[in-house]
């Protein structure tokens, strides 16, 4: 999976992975569409768009929910997140009525497979696609609740009317979501994008990370204060864990970065210091 980290909001040519001080602009690492279907056979994993809302009679009058996730590994764990905004491009708006499009935090992991659909009806799911019933199609990993397991709390909402670019402004809940994912990356399951699920033809289509025009991809902007360097984190992964213990033991008796008390050699005192700061 590919994602990009941009140095500014000005996109010139192809998007590359770089960083800017205390701000990053990231394109998704995965996105997809949950398509309401009693058999759970449809998905849009590799399509250039995803959907949120309810389709019309010709589409079965069923619900669509977007799924979007961003790789936040460029932010050092325990950095302080201060602002989070999401920009998405609505490329088809149906009846062009104003509809609320909300972000809700997923509580379980999900997949993006190779299914390609040319409309909101989706295509037959491919291995590891999410579907209405499956988190990873072709496996036994199912949603507890058909249609996705996500929070009832709205992290952010934005009225979307016609086609164009829309920004979901920073909220305390968006900040809290990203902060939790930065501190514990294994819990980063992204957001469910939820529209008006009552009114027929309320569905909105958003361009995905697979869209051919780079500037139309979704982008997450995160502003943060980097965590101060931790001398116990010898491997610089943001945690004091087994990798750091291995590094310390590998330099035992020598003058190295693991000599925390500057005694001239790594010894039991340094081992005790590392274990006292253990984060796992």
Task: Label each PLM-derived region with a short phrase.
Residues 171-214, 223-226:
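Ser/Thr/Pro-rich, low-complexity mucin-like regions
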Residues 28, 93-180:
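Beta-strand-rich interaction/scaffold domains
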Residues 70, 80-92, 220:
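A short beta-strand element within beta-rich, extracytoplasmic domains
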């Amino acid at each position: 999976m590919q994602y990009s980290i941009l140095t500014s909001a000005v996109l010139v040519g192809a998007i590359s992975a770089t960083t800017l001080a205390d701000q990053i602009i990231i394109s998704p690492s995965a996105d997809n569409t949950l398509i309401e279907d009693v058999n759970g056979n449809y998905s849009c994993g590799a399509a250039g768009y995803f959907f949120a809302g309810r389709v019309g009679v010709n589409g079965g009058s069923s619900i669509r929910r977007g799924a979007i996730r961003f790789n936040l590994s460029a932010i050092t764990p325990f950095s302080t997140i201060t602002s989070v905004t999401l920009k998405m491009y609505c490329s088809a708006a149906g009846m062009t009525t104003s509809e609320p499009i909300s972000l809700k935090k997923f509580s379980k992991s999900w997949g993006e497979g190779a299914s390609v659909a040319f409309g909101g009806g989706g295509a037959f799911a491919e291995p590891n696609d999410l579907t209405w019933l499956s988190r990873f199609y072709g496996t036994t990993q199912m949603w507890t609740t058909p249609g996705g397991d996500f929070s009832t709390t709205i992290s952010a909402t934005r009225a979307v009317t016609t086609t164009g670019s829309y920004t979901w402004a920073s909220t305390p809940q968006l900040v809290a979501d990203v902060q939790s994912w930065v501190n514990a990356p294994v819990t980063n399951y992204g957001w469910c994008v939820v529209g008006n699920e009552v009114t027929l033809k309320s569905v909105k289509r958003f361009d995905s990370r697979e869209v051919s025009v780079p500037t139309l991809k979704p982008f997450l902007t995160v502003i943060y204060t980097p965590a101060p360097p931790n001398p116990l984190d010898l491997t610089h992964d943001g945690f004091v864990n087994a990798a750091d213990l291995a590094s310390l033991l590998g330099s035992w008796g020598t003058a190295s970065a693991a000599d925390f008390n500057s005694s001239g050699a790594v010894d039991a005192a340094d081992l005790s210091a590392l274990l006292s700061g253990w984060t796992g």
